Amino acid sequence: MNVFDFFGSAVCHQMAERSFFWGSCQSPLCARCTAIEGGIVLGVIFLWLAGRKDGNRPFSPSGMVLEALSFLPIAIDGVGSYLGFWQSNNLLRVLTGALAGYGLPGLFLLAANFSPAKENINPVYKNTGEQLILLLVAVAYGLLVWLGILPYFLVALVSAVGVVCFYGCFWFLILLTMTAGKKFPCFPLSLAGGLFTVFVVATIVQRIS
């Protein structure tokens, strides 16, 4: 098991029949998780580059609708295939995963920064167009993986970083809630917490599997 597979085991079942292959190299995550974590990485990069770490203004009505609808396909496909109504495939998995993953960082950021006791004027997204572009980029990433265009190392690296960011989002929410109104290096500590959590969870998974 390489380091990418180790990181992936912290969130994913890693079933071969639901994963991608580059020769003998299996993706560290299943198709759905690959797209989810890819979307998370893209969301984190966007919010960081756009300087939205203080975003606390609720989404616009259309933005909220888009965010809610983005989670609907993964719920329908997951439940429907689990109950045996249809057999899902890797294309459906990457599409539904990308739709769900891109918006998670924004939701965590809003949950961490929003305060009913003050005026929330800093946008997470300036408009719905930003969300839509981010969504389309996440879907494009998933399709490129599905088509086999992207190399193994890039997909594996993005997947591993995405797992760290996923757990890091929880740490960010916790740290910002605990240190509200105080200057505290929440972002780097959140990444460190995410990395630590991945190591602990993956180690436990390896021990019991």
Give residue ranges: language-model regions:
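Secretory/periplasmic and organellar redox-cofactor proteins
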Residues: 1-26, 31-43, 47-209
